[in-house]
Amino acid sequence: MRAVVQRVLKGSVTVNNEVVGKIGQGLVVLLGVGQGDCVDDARYLADKISQLRIFDDEQGKLNLSIQDVKGSILAISQFTLYGDCRKGRRPGYSGAAAPDTARELYESFVQRLVCNGLTTSTGVFQEHMVVEIINDGPVTLLLDSRKGF
């Protein structure tokens, strides 16, 4: 399971001209589910993201977590994180999980964030979404539950 984590001042996601998710200060998480991923991967990433110290403390040091700053998370599914661009000019997505499995694990990830006490908004799985964010920092991290990077 892969995640792109971006610290934001605010973010929103729109589907069919309707805002379906919106946050203020917090994190936007683009989550991709891969072949062979399981609920343990979802738990690992949700717990890791909940505790990452990537917000500034009083001295301007990255020392506070999303929980410490009482921020929110906007979680958006994104199978294209498993795009393989090594051959040709069109990405291949054979590394991405099947939609039913991906949906189940994405929902497990979101539920774990909520269980960790985080206010969490989402996009709509398998829909075309317009995502608007205002990056803060910028702070952008790549996480992989298999620790591939």
Swiss-Prot record:
InterPro entries: Daa-tRNA_deacyls_DTD, DTD-like_sf. The keyword tRNA-binding applies. It comes from the Bacteria. Pfam families: Tyr_Deacylase. One of its GO terms (cellular component) is cytoplasm. Its EC number is 3.1.1.96. It is found in: Cytoplasm. A motif (Gly-cisPro motif, important for rejection of L-amino acids) lies at residues 137-138. It catalyses: glycyl-tRNA(Ala) + H2O = tRNA(Ala) + glycine + H(+); a D-aminoacyl-tRNA + H2O = a tRNA + a D-alpha-amino acid + H(+). Its main location: cytoplasm. The keyword rRNA-binding does not apply. GO terms for molecular function: D-tyrosyl-tRNA(Tyr) deacylase activity; Gly-tRNA(Ala) deacylase activity; Ser(Gly)-tRNA(Ala) hydrolase activity; tRNA binding. An aminoacyl-tRNA editing enzyme that deacylates mischarged D-aminoacyl-tRNAs. Also deacylates mischarged glycyl-tRNA(Ala), protecting cells against glycine mischarging by AlaRS. Acts via tRNA-based rather than protein-based catalysis; rejects L-amino acids rather than detecting D-amino acids in the active site. By recycling D-aminoacyl-tRNA to D-amino acids and free tRNA molecules, this enzyme counteracts the toxicity associated with the formation of D-aminoacyl-tRNA entities in vivo and helps enforce protein L-homochirality. NCBIfam families: D-aminoacyl-tRNA deacylase (TIGR00256). Homodimer. A Gly-cisPro motif from one monomer fits into the active site of the other monomer to allow specific chiral rejection of L-amino acids. Belongs to the DTD family. This is D-aminoacyl-tRNA deacylase. It comes from Desulforamulus reducens (strain ATCC BAA-1160 / DSM 100696 / MI-1). The gene is dtd.
